[in-house]
C-alpha cells in the first residue's frame, strides 16, 4: 500500500523534520518538535524570496551527534527549514511519480502510514516478524550473503535521483531545471550547500531519496536473487556459495552505476543454518521476569547480568535491551534502585541516558535532589565529548527536575 500524499506532507513537516528515526524517539527530548509546522505555515515560508548569494550557496544543516551502543557517535542533521520545506512540497507535488517506492518488497524501511503520524521509522522489526521471514526465506538455502553500502547517505549523489526516477538516458538528455525530476534534485542540493554529494542523515526526506535510488537497483537484483534490504544493509539467501558471491558482485556493479560502493569490512558470506537471535538475547530473556513487577533486589541482579554480558559481547546493545525491558515493570521503590544503578552506567554508556526519563519522573521530589550532582557531572562529561543527544536529554532532565521547581 502506498502512502497518501496529504498524510505524507503532514508527516514530513510535523513529524519527520527532526532526526527522530526510532520508534521511541530517543534521539531528542520531546521539547524538540515541529508539530506547529503545518501546511499553511510551510506555504508561507516557501514564498520567502532568496537573495542571489543564498540561491548560489544553498543552505547548511545543524550537525547533531547521537551515541551508539559501542559509544561511537553517529552524525545526524537538522536541516534548514526553508530548503527542507521546498523538498517536501516537490515530493508532494510529484508523489504519483515517486510513490512506487512504498511497494518495494525487498525494502524493510520505506514510507508507510504509521500511527504516530510519521511516515518513516527506522527501527528493526518485531522478533516474530523476523522469525517468520527467516523460516520462509532460509528454507532450502545454504548460505547468507551480507553486504552494506559504504557511507550511504553522505555518498548519495543528488543527480542519481533523476537517474533512478526516469532512467540514465532520459535524465541526461533532459537537464532543464523545469523538469520535475531535476526540481527534486535541485532542492536536495540546496539543503546541502548546493553540493551534489550527500543528503542530510535523519529527516525522512533523506530516506525517500535513498529509497528512490536503491529501489531502482532492487528492480534489477530481485530478478535473480532472494534478498532483503534494511536501509543500506543487504541480506541474501543463496543455494550455493557461488550464488552468494555472484550476488555481491552484481550488487557492487549496480551500486557503482549510481556512484555508490560496498563497505568491504561488512561484506561476508556465512553458512546456514544461523541462529535467529544472538546468544545474549536468550540469556537476558531467561533472567528478566515476564509480566511481573520487578522489586528492588531484582533490579541489581538483572543489570549485573547485563553488565557481565556486555563485556563479553561488546558489539551488542545488551545494557539498553535490559534497561528497556524492565523500566516499565518498576514500582516506586525499585524505580529508586533502578535510577541509582542506571545513573552510574550512563557515565560509561551514554546511550542509556534517554531511558532515565520515566524512572526520574517517578522518583519522589525529595529524593530527586540527590541526583543533582550526578546529572551535572554527566552534563559536563557529555559536553567534553561533544555528545549532542546526551547533552540535550540531560539538560531536559535538569530543567524539569530542578530549575523548573525554582520558578513555581
Model-predicted regions and their roles:
Residues 132-231, 236-248, 292-408:
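Conserved polymerase palm-domain catalytic core
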Amino acid at each position: 500500500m502506498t502512502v497518501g500524499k496529504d498524510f505524507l506532507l503532514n508527516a514530513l513537516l510535523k513529524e519527520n523534520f527532526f532526526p527522530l528515526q526510532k520508534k521511541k524517539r530517543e534521539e531528542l527530548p520531546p521539547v524538540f518538535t515541529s508539530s506547529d509546522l503545518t501546511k499553511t505555515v510551510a506555504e508561507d515560508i516557501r514564498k520567502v524570496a532568496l537573495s542571489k548569494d543564498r540561491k548560489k550557496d544553498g543552505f547548511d544543516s545543524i550537525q547533531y551527534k547521537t551515541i551508539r551502543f559501542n559509544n561511537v557517535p553517529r552524525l545526524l542533521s537538522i536541516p534548514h527549514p526553508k530548503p527542507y520545506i521546498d523538498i517536501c512540497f516537490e515530493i508532494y507535488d510529484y508523489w504519483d511519480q515517486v510513490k512506487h517506492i512504498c511497494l518495494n518488497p525487498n525494502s524493510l524501511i520505506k514510507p508507510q502510514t504509521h500511527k504516530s503520524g510519521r511516515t518513516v521509522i527506522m527501527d528493526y522489526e518485531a522478533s516474530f516478524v523476523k522469525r517468520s521471514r527467516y523460516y520462509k526465506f532460509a528454507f532450502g538455502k545454504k548460505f547468507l550473503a551480507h553486504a552494506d553500502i559504504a557511507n550511504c547517505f553522505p555518498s548519495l549523489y543528488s543527480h542519481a535521483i533523476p537517474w533512478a526516477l526516469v532512467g540514465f538516458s532520459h535524465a541526461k538528455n533532459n537537464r532543464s531545471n523545469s523538469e520535475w525530476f531535476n526540481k527534486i534534485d535541485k532542492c536536495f542540493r540546496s539543503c546541502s550547500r548546493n553540493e551534489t554529494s550527500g543528503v542530510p542523515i535523519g529527516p525522512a526526506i533523506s530516506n525517500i531519496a535513498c529509497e528512490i535510488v536503491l529501489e531502482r537497483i532492487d528492480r534489477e537484483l530481485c530478478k535473480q536473487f532472494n534478498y532483503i534490504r534494511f536501509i543500506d544493509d543487504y541480506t541474501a539467501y543463496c543455494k550455493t556459495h557461488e550464488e552468494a558471491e555472484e550476488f555481491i558482485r552484481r550488487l557492487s556493479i549496480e551500486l557503482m552505476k549510481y556512484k555508490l560502493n560496498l563497505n568491504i569490512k561488512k561484506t561476508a558470506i556465512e553458512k546456514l543454518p544461523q541462529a535467529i537471535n544472538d546468544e545474549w538475547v536468550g540469556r537476558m530473556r531467561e533472567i528478566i521476569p515476564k509480566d511481573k513487577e520487578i522489586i528492588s533486589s531484582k533490579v541489581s541482579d538483572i543489570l549485573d547480568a547485563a553488565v557481565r554480558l556486555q563485556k563479553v559481547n561488546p558489539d551488542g546493545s545488551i545494557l539498553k535491551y535490559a534497561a528497556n525491558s524492565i523500566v516499565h515493570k518498576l514500582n516506586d521503590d525499585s524505580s529508586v534502585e533502578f535510577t541509582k544503578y542506571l545513573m552510574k552506567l550512563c557515565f560509561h554508556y551514554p546511550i542509556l541516558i534517554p531511558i532515565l526519563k520515566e524512572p526520574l519522573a517517578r522518583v519522589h521530589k525529595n529524593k530527586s535532589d540527590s541526583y543533582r550532582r550526578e546529572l551535572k557531572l554527566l552534563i559536563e562529561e557529555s559536553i567534553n565529548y561533544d555528545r549532542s543527544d546526551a547533552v540535550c536529554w540531560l539538560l531536559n532532565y535538569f530543567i524539569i527536575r530542578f530549575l523548573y521547581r525554582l520558578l513555581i
